[in-house]
């Protein structure tokens, strides 16, 4: 498998996993959705806001070289409907971006400033892998918070995504 094929598979997984978390979050009451649970961004709502903010900000870095909207501003998106809309838009833009990639672009180095303004540079494939891994971390925190509320969600392991995808290919 090439780097490009791997990145495409990881971004398919990332979108699927985000959608499963959003679907599970839709079964929470408003209180449960915003309840402080001790996760990095306090609540299911906060974690989802952070995940989508990171996706949007990294995409902006990759396409324009800068953050057009500060992470803190994007994280102010509140309510499941608004978050769902933000995720849908970020997934659409990420699909377009991933479709435009080639191996040369993935191996290319991108200079950028992080959310604290620190300058760094990394190969695109590392940055893109980071975004998926970052989302996995915060989805796991979200799953833990939901389990603590007695509302566990489905397995989000990558292998289950591939098993489901293989089944869909056979069935359909």
Question: Model features per residue range: what roles?
Answer:
Residues 65-106:
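Helix-adjacent hinge/juxtasegments
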Residues 11-23, 27-73, 114-172:
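Short, contiguous alpha-helical
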Residues 3-6, 78-79, 94, 126-128:
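A ubiquitous short alpha-helical element
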Residues 1-10, 34:
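Short, charged, low-complexity loops and linkers
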Residues 7-10, 44, 83, 106:
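Hydrophobic side chains within well-formed alpha-helices
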Residues 103-115:
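Carboxylate-rich helix-loop segments that flank metal/cofactor sites and access channels
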Residues 3-4, 30, 55, 103:
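Alpha-helix initiation and N-capping motif
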Residues 9-20, 85-89, 93:
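A non-catalytic, amphipathic alpha-helix used as a structural packing/dimerization or gating element
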């Amino acid at each position: 498998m090439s780097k490009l094929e791997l990145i495409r598979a990881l971004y398919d997984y990332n979108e699927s996993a985000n959608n499963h978390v959003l679907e599970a979050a839709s079964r929470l009451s408003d209180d449960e959705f915003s309840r402080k649970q001790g996760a990095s961004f306090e609540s299911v709502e906060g974690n989802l806001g952070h995940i989508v903010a990171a996706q949007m900000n990294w995409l902006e870095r990759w396409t324009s070289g800068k953050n057009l909207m500060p992470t803190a501003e994007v994280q102010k998106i509140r309510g499941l409907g608004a978050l769902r809309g933000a995720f849908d838009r970020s997934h659409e833009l990420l699909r377009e971006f991933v479709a435009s990639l080639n191996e040369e672009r993935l191996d290319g180095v991108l200079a950028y400033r992080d959310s604290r303004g620190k300058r760094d540079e990394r190969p695109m494939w590392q940055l893109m892998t980071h975004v998926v891994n970052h989302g996995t971390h915060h989805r796991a925190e979200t799953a833990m918070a939901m389990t603590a509320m007695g509302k566990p969600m489905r397995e989000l392991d990558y292998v289950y995504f591939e098993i489901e995808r293989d089944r869909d290919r056979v069935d359909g």
